[in-house]
């Protein structure tokens, strides 16, 4: 399960806006993850690598979606909404 997180980081760092969204969505669907707490932490720890120039905004996005993660029914929808905002911010 850790592999999918590293792939997400690689996608954020290297792919364009359209491909990033499509590939992250597919990756999360394929990995069948239901708990994204480790992903939130990894994204925070590595924000300097993938969010250069937008670090403060990315941290605020992570915080907002981590908070809502605790109360939403479908966590995959919540995490993809987060990636829509992140990708829109950094690409």
Predicted regions, residues:
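AAA+ P-loop NTPase domains with strong preference for DNA replication initiators
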Residues: 1-91
């Amino acid at each position: 399960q850790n592999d999918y997180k590293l792939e997400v980081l690689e996608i954020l760092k290297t792919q364009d806006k359209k491909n990033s969204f499509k590939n992250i969505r597919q990756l999360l669907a394929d990995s069948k993850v239901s708990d994204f707490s480790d992903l939130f932490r990894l994204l925070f720890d590595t924000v300097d690598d993938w969010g250069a120039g937008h670090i403060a905004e990315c941290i605020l996005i992570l915080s907002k979606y981590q908070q809502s993660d605790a109360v939403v029914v479908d966590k995959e929808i919540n995490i993809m909404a987060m990636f829509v905002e992140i990708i829109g911010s950094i690409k």
